[in-house]
């Protein structure tokens, strides 16, 4: 029994015994999730952190009940730990997307001509607050993001994030109203006519796929890292212990590492590609070979993806223990290249088979035996994560005549 007053940061949840026990500091991100009683692989948490740091928009997809929403909520709480409930409320906006959203009013509010005031939303209040405190990270979590068409209510945000450049890092501005001096309906001050999305705001959208949701367009998927949650390991879950993992952070205390440093930016550019090539010239050949495969089917990617993959590689090189280029590229193929693939057997059968062959170093024959090995995570592949997903997509193509990365 724990006596006296104990800080939450000194407690940790033991999933095997279903008890709370004493732990060390909750500075480390992996320990913090454990203390909350949630089981996520270290690789998954590392990928989420690096994805946010590479670009402040991440999509989490996968089967229901795997913790997509919780990984985003707990990460935001981890960064904001030690703050009062009121302060956390200003820094974190949890938004349940409504199926009737046809424009950005659900996120940004609107000017009401009747009372001549601006009706402010939680997200707009957070954006205004973040603009006043650029040294603090803020989080917007869009739960069930695809209950409405993302292109309709979130397109302004996507366009503005893409408009950031070296000479204009703030990007273009959101249009809010044209009514001059306008007070907020909640009485908390003025609302400007135009507002830049602060670079210290991080967006995460969770996705479920059923008959009530919409699929994403390539335009949306091209602008995010997509992390899939489908792996459920009951044996590890029961023991509360993970298998040895390789993609882990050098320093798991990332509370002050999310915001860009003095020489960093929250957008990608050609400089990231140049920096990645300096770190490992092999990245050119890997990406060029991949482009040559996909170009045959007009499924190739553009310079934005090249820059963002390179940015992720540079971040991983700086922060991941025992950096391995093939491992990092495997993760980026899985998160940046494959999510846009969906279509019929006639469209995707040949390119998907060529892609899974690309995931192996040596020349391979694509048959049922290889697909079975790849589906079980084949360590002989140079890109085993991507090969595993491709094997599933090819199987769906053969059985259903149609496949999609997001399922």
PLM feature spans:
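AAA+ P-loop NTPase catalytic core and its hallmark functional loops
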Residues: 4-257
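Alpha-helical lid/collar subdomain of P-loop NTPases
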Residues: 6-16, 22-23, 242-407
